[in-house]
């Protein structure tokens, strides 16, 4: 009998595109996901399309989709990119609940942080999280973020 070995998932991030809007709306409207997110629920496709259109060409933010083995599974990005002061705000939200806890967020975050510190030449990345969002806090500590306040 052949034994099948588990291989690690291939994780990548890519720029958020118009085609990703329905998935983002689905993920955010899922009660398992939106407890720690700051959105007016239910999120609507039309409102999200307007958000997307209003952000085209902006250089002060970078919105991306996380893919694991080619399947979209969450969003990640940088907000308030301030090149003058070399800083930005980081965010991440895993949408596919069945893929949580598999290390995808860690891998995607490392890719994004490499981009932020390498290509964008930033020297400070910060974030905000809810006090009760312990899984996210563990991820952020693992990535080297330091708790303030």
Which residues make up each language-model segment?
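Acyl-donor (CoA/ACP) binding surface of acyl/acetyltransferases
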Residues: 2-23, 63, 68-149
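Short loop/turn motifs at secondary-structure junctions and domain boundaries
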Residues: 54-60
